Amino acid sequence: MIKKINAVISNLFLTLIRFYRSWISPLLGPSCRFVPTCSEYGVEAIEKHGPWKGGWLTLKRLLRCNPLTPCGYDPVPDK
C-alpha cells in the first residue's frame, strides 16, 4: 500500500515538472544557474530517492537557484 502511495506521489511530482518544462519554462527562457538544470535535478532526485527525499532535495535545490549563490555543477547525491 505504501509503495502504491509513493508511486502516485512520484508520478504527481514528475507530472508537475513535465508541465513546467512544457508550458512555463518556454515562456521564461533559460534561467537555471546549475548543471543539471533544476527540473532535470528534480526528475533524477525523485527517480533515485523517491517522492519524499527526492522532493526535499529538489526543494532545497530550487531555493539555492538564485543570484546570491554560486552556479555550476550540482549533481543529485547518491543514496
Curated annotation (Swiss-Prot):
InterPro entries: Membr_insert_effic_factor_YidD. Its main location: membrane. It is a peripheral membrane protein. SMART domains: Haemolytic. It is found in: Cell inner membrane. Keywords: Cell inner membrane, Cell membrane, Membrane. The keyword Aminoacyl-tRNA synthetase does not apply. One of its GO terms (cellular component) is plasma membrane. It comes from the Bacteria. The keyword Secreted does not apply. Belongs to the UPF0161 family. Could be involved in insertion of integral membrane proteins into the membrane. This is Putative membrane protein insertion efficiency factor. The lineage of its organism: Bacteria, Bacillati, Cyanobacteriota, Cyanophyceae, Synechococcales.
